[in-house]
């Protein structure tokens, strides 16, 4: 992760004060505190515990005040939302790693000194104001940075208390939306991605900027989406704090702030009713697909095209899926007079993929056989050439490795060559040579929640088969589920072109794809520009496409259908 360097840096550990509301704490705060225990460059030295005047009210008085201020239906809608959320957690959040996001922890479980303050909520607006005595109390602690662990927005002197200001994690896309309730509105609006931003606020005006932004595929339900974005974002809060001590307090190079002063908006009863209908429709469609034995099924097509920029995809020649299987992730290659297409060959019966190869000759094609078959899943057969030798880097994420295989006899005989990385959650790797270095692009899951579609990481080495790759200074170089995961890679003269996948709502894998030109790549910089977008509209009834391959006039693409499968 890259953080702009500034003049003011510190050599000791960064002292952090964590601002939390009084009461039980959510799993995200627990996760950050736990990660801080192994931090090298920072420590959470104090919990700044906020208590508000209205928290002294009993339950009946609080309900009366809310009804008087906001109307009768607001507390009813809140109660309904809690009920929906609890049901979704029970039914849909099965993974213990995700479910832990909703665990609650008493303040006494955190063995960190606690400083109690009573900020003032203004009658209008969202900016919490701290009283002078509380500000002096915090100043006396010698804290370097405050970390915001609650939902409010700050104003006034609290922004000047620490040299590094306040670091705040904002869920949602504050660039375009002013509605609150993190992770809900993205599901309700069926948006393909759910975003978060980590920003730093400095000075009375709250100036500063965004330290980083990221997005992940939007999950089908509110509870799933909230768990996933919570787990993903807290990993990067920890990493950011690790790097902040050496980066300094300067705001030079920060992204434009995504802060909005629009008031938070919780869903009304009408919105919640519509949300339930949408969720039931998704569940009903999935039940119908199961009962009718329908499943997602990929297919592959190819064609000849003088230029990759203007293929007539609708005229692609489709390779029929074999019984009980599907073909995906095509990579075409020419050697001599032989034209072939390597594919992921997935078997529904074994629930595992292998690598197969088809020979192509004009409108005709036929299966040559299996290229690689391992006791684990294989896909994405990326091929590259070094000194007239061919190597394949297929996806081997099931065993937590990035592996390399060498061609013994083209195109069918390949053997294991070397493991480039171990103990990594990485998929769809591209390897290429540029400016005296070998580069490796792959998508990681830093949070261990199974999201391998959002973070593009770059590495470099002096050797293509090194097992010691240096990470790029700005990793992840792309943090966006609509453009991070690779779907191919090829050259057009001196131009480097990376195919990227665009994930859809409900974690629809490979809804569409695009092609980006890599304009600049070195150990400190990564810059790419989208030059083409391809939608799933070139074959009837398809719902996705996610791999594009081009080699010397031969082009291949894949597509996704929902159809009956006999396993």
Predicted segment positions?
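Loop/turn-rich, solvent-exposed surfaces of beta-rich toroidal or solenoidal domains
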Residues: 437-465, 481-517
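Trp- and S/T/G-rich repeat-edge/linker motifs of beta-rich repeat architectures
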Residues: 365-367, 412-417, 469-473, 523-534
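Beta-rich, blade/repeat-based domains predominating
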Residues: 328-331, 379-384, 427-432, 485-490, ...
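One-carbon transfer enzymes
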Residues: 2-378, 382-391, 401-407, 418, ...
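Residue-level signature of beta-propeller blades and closely related beta-rich strand-turn architectures
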Residues: 345-347, 396-398, 444-446, 502-504, ...
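Conserved blade-ending motifs and adjacent loop-strand segments that build the rim/top face
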Residues: 473-488, 524-546
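Short loop/turn segments immediately following beta-strands, especially the blade-tip
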Residues: 407-411, 461-467, 517-527
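Blade-level signature of beta-propeller repeat domains, shared across WD40, Kelch, NHL, RCC1
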Residues: 512-518, 539-567
